[in-house]
Amino acid sequence: MAEPIYRRVLVKLSGEYFAGPQDYGIDQATIDRVAGELIAARSLGIEIAVVIGGGNIFRGVEVSARGVSRTTGDTMGMLATVMNCLALAEALQRHGQKARTLAALMMPEVCELYTRAAAEQTLREGGIALLAAGTGNPYFTTDTAAVLRAAEIGAGAVLKATNVDGVYSADPKLDPNAKRFEKLTHSEALAGGYKVMDATAFALARETSLPIIVFSIAEPGSIGAVLSGAGRATVVAG
């Protein structure tokens, strides 16, 4: 395998993926497989931080439509991301990989508070930093949190793990004529309205000149392959 393109990255994982075939909650086999993928990438000498969504457990936007305030709903969603990070941290540790959960909300009995210094220390010491609770503020998605944290810790790129191998002009599962893009600029991604990440995340990535690499997590070895320039992915940069 070729030398990795980046030495420090942030991997953005969807909470929905953690549900596995059951569509809700945490599927342990899926968690273990993701842990294995991250450990394999870490073995290449890459420093890895991770942001996970919480949609497999709770979605604040959906509950706010049923009468709960958006602020409360988003806060509940942040707690779901903490659950996912704790589950992944335990899976990583069980396989011998040091991992540390750092949350944007204070909950000292559960995990440590996120600071850039704590995250960078974890990475330098060979651990995987799991960054929970989004930005710690309502109205911001975990995609935006991923770009923000990546910029803060000096990551070379955000790896956006999805269930398809890049950005398409339409949902390839619904439209057989959907066009797959090898590369897009941040502005093109914003103008195209592609649903792979929200507009705020793309705009922040453009402002900070941070590449976003969109790939399929379903393929074994996909993280390492993408980081070595061998995997199928769409690069959003420039």
UniProtKB/Swiss-Prot annotation:
Catalysed reaction, written as an equation = UMP + ATP = UDP + ADP
The positions annotated for binding UMP are: G54, D74, T135, G136, N137, P138, Y139, F140, T141, T142
Location in the cell reads: Cytoplasm
BP-aspect Gene Ontology terms: 'de novo' CTP biosynthetic process; UDP biosynthetic process
What the entry lists under InterPro entries is as follows: AceGlu_kinase-like_sf, Asp/Glu/Uridylate_kinase, Uridylate_kinase, Uridylate_kinase_bac
Give Gene Ontology CC terms: cytosol
What are the binding positions for ATP in this chain? Answer: K12, L13, S14, G15, G55, R59, T162, N163, Y168, D171
Protein name as it appears in the record = Uridylate kinase
Its gene is: pyrH
